[in-house]
């Protein structure tokens, strides 16, 4: 799905069928490029958001092609390396715009959101909203409870520099 930094990025997906109803569910998981920096004419580093935006466009295009106007539920999850609110730093609003126009954000639309930040950078005091770079987008379902799995009962304080995110849905 459109790459720059840290080399080629991929997307895995699966088509599922709910036995009880016969309804189709598509699930996509990806990891967008990290800090795709380029240099401007004066040699200053600037962020190139186009690889992330292109990845969002590809995901939406693939989703639309698979659903083809049907009633399938679609989920896109992953470390998208930008937040909806990060403004100029990584320009998440522009990078994620194709997804936001086609789908909903589980973090923003779930009936319950725990308010926790998903990225921690191995820093116990990290609490910037721009750290919400791990996303669940959806279409054709109803988001119930969005949880960032940040408990400290794993035997170590940090299980990763990102906490897993989960959401319960009604199809």
Describe the role of every protein-language-model region.
Residues 1-171:
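Active-site regions of metal-assisted phosphoester/phosphodiester hydrolases
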């Amino acid at each position: 799905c459109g790459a720059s930094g840290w080399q080629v990025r991929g997307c895995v997906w699966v088509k599922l069928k709910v036995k009880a109803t016969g309804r189709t569910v598509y699930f996509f998981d990806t990891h967008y490029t990290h800090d795709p920096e380029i240099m401007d004419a004066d040699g200053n580093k600037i962020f190139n958001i186009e690889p992330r935006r292109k990845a969002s466009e590809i995901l939406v295009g693939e989703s639309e092609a698979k659903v083809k106007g049907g009633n399938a539920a679609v989920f896109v999850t992953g470390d998208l390396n930008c937040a909806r609110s990060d403004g100029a730093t990584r320009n998440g609003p522009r990078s994620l715009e194709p997804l936001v126009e086609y789908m909903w954000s589980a973090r923003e639309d779930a009936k319950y959101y725990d308010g926790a930040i998903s990225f921690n950078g191995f820093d116990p005091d990290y609490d910037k909203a721009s750290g919400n770079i791990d996303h669940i987008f959806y279409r054709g379902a109803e988001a119930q409870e969005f949880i960032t799995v940040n408990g400290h009962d794993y035997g170590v304080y940090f299980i990763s520099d990102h906490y897993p995110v989960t959401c319960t849905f009604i199809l």
